[in-house]
Regions:
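Short glycine/proline- and charge-enriched loop/turn segments
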Residues: 76-83, 149-153
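Domain-scale signature associated with acetyltransferase and cell-envelope carbohydrate enzymes
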Residues: 1-70, 93-94, 112, 128, ...
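Beta-rich strand-turn-strand
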Residues: 50-52, 100-114, 120-123
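A short, glycine- and basic residue-enriched loop/turn
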Residues: 90, 107-108, 129
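Glycine-rich NAD(P)-binding loop of Rossmann-like domains
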Residues: 82-95
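Short-chain dehydrogenase/reductase
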Residues: 62, 97, 115, 121, ...
Length: 192
């Protein structure tokens, strides 16, 4: 049986209690949503990817916090009871970076190595090796394809990666102490 949304190798998904990741396919009635995520993806907290037809995400793509990708309007324009409206496939080619809270709408193709600025709304295709930003997203700058280093290179040296993660862990956890843990155990924050 084919997976509804296969996730590529070496994917990094970062969820938080206030930033749950939502990967959804709508498979009811005539709708047969599919989602394919390539290798080396980075999906940050609060990302929502919703498919009623097909969303294809290439290798080494990155999603900033709260980014939203959909291939549907989720309701008909005239018939508001029409559940998924008229979905259109979305394609993100390899090494695309979607900024925080950006919205990628149905029917869009984003070319390889492109960057979508934070808070942008993309309703039309994006050329490869480009930066687009704004609402609606507009061309900002052409990128030199020869200068681009894809996310998969992050994994090319496992020893360096391990060392980098140890440094990162020390930075993130440096303020954690036994006393802090005991205090949090007995005086819990009501939100956690």
């Amino acid at each position: 049986m084919e997976a509804i949304f296969p996730l590529g190798n070496y994917a990094t998904l970062i969820g938080e209690s206030d930033g749950i990741i939502q990967l959804t396919t709508w498979n009811v009635g005539k709708w047969d949503g599919k989602l394919k995520i390539g290798d080396y993806a980075l999906i940050s907290p609060g990302v929502r990817i919703l498919s009623a037809k097909m969303i294809t995400i290439g290798n080494s793509c990155m999603f900033g916090r709260g980014a939203y990708v959909t291939d549907s309007d989720w309701h008909g324009v005239y018939d508001r009871n029409e559940v998924a409206g008229s979905p259109k496939e979305v394609i993100l080619e390899d090494n695309v970076w979607i900024g925080d809270s950006a919205i990628i709408c149905k029917g869009v193709r984003i070319g390889k190595n492109s960057i979508i600025g934070a808070g942008s709304v993309v309703t039309k295709n994006v050329e490869p090796n480009s930066i687009y930003a704004g609402n609606p997203a507009k061309f900002v700058k052409k990128l030199d394809e020869q200068e681009i280093i894809p996310r998969k290179n992050f994994y090319s040296n496992p020893k360096k990666l391990k060392d980098d993660f140890e440094i990162l862990d020390k930075l993130v956890l440096k303020d954690n102490t036994f006393f802090g843990w005991v205090k949090s155990f007995f005086y819990r924050n009501k939100d956690h």
